[in-house]
Amino acid sequence: MPVKLDHETHVYTNTETGEKYTSVTTLIGNYKKPFDKDKWSKLVAKREGVSQDEILNKWSSITTTAQNRGTNVHLVMENYIKDKKIEQGYEELVDSFIKKTNGVILPNSKILSEELLFTHEFKIAGTADLVVENNNIFYIMDFKTNKKFNFINKYNDYFYEPIDYLPQCEFTTYTIQLSIYAWMYEQLTGKKCGGLKIFYLREFNDKTFWQEIPCTYMKSSVVDILNDKKLKDTKHT
């Protein structure tokens, strides 16, 4: 593999040149308005009548719990996809995935889990949760377990140029992420993207299931981002 991932540091490296590649998550983050943790934690602390440190510690605890949960659920799905192993207590969750991918994952499908994708030209890399190949058509799917999933931005925030026509929210962020994966997979294989899907973890009446959210392949936006990155990289060299 010409690019490797250090799972502890989450750094992608070109194995031949030693050059570090920008992760897809970091790349997208460069076009987002950063969250002002200091400002908002002070406001929340004042509103709730507690110290700022209490709010920051609370947020940190919530983040850690969510990350652990996400890691566990991803492992459950990875074990099923790779080995058809269903972990005890997750039968309903896996069953909801099977039913919702029935028309895409076929008996003769090529299934790739945790597939590392990259582009040497633009020096970026990322890992797709699931790639499904049916002959010359492929589908990319991603599991999301975060608590918040918005389709709009209530503060009317948008991404930075050159994608400043897109609202800054979870749905758009993930759509861009999967679109970049699709673009890289097209370049690596010559195959065509048949669809992108987010599987969002939901709970209702003590039942856990996947909500299937189709995404549009935003190829032109991906090209805009990549060309902008390349231009900025050139200016910095």
Model segments located where?
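Charged, glycine-rich intrinsically disordered N-terminal tails and low-complexity linkers that flank
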Residues: 1-72
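Accessory terminal regions of nucleic-acid processing enzymes
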Residues: 2, 10, 82, 116, ...
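A structure-centric signal for secondary-structure junctions around beta-strands
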Residues: 6-8, 15, 67, 127, ...
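Secondary-structure junction/capping motif
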Residues: 20-24, 88-91, 169
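A short, sequence-level motif marking secondary-structure junctions
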Residues: 26-29, 146-147, 216-221
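Catalytic cores of nuclease domains that cleave nucleic-acid phosphodiester backbones
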Residues: 58-163
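Metal-dependent nuclease catalytic regions and adjoining charged, substrate-binding loops involved
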Residues: 168-237
